[in-house]
Amino acid sequence: EKMNRAKEVAGKEPIFQILPYEHKKVGIVTTGSEVYHGRIQDTFTPVIVDKVTEYGAEIEGHEICDDNPEMIEDAIHDLLRRGCNMILCTGGMSVDPDDRTPLAIKNVTGNVVSYGAPVLPGAMFLLAYTKDGKPIMGLPGCVMYAKRTIFDLVLPRVMADVPVTKADLAKMGAGGLC
């Protein structure tokens, strides 16, 4: 009786699905004057490479940019032209006046799903999609240090070509911690 009721409530939609990960060519844009001018080493990119290659993605390109929105936009456009179907931007994601990555992503896509997520670590996460549906993510610094962040919650969906909405991100806030 309970199983019949469960079937009735579920309707024709599956209760859950297992979707395959799609092959992604990933472009990484590292921003920040400190890295661009060689004052500090880029320690973020190796972390990102490890995370995305776990899903079978390949790194198609990596650009290092100064804190200049036009330079960041050019790097994103260049990676898209080179065939990248996912762009990950590191650096410049906080609220400092010289953090220009969110502006550059907005200018490229015009379609920011969310700048900010109700999940810690990762509150300054940004998700956007290009007009043809390619995801561009702005990753906060915590992704470099914390074992699990909002990026680790979103990445499997993106790798399976499941569009992530603002409502999806809001639902991840139940509990608020990764």
Predicted regions and their residues:
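Short, glycine/charged-enriched hinge/interface segments at domain edges or termini
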Residues: E1-E60
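Short glycine/threonine-rich loop/turn motifs
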Residues: S33, T43, A57-C178
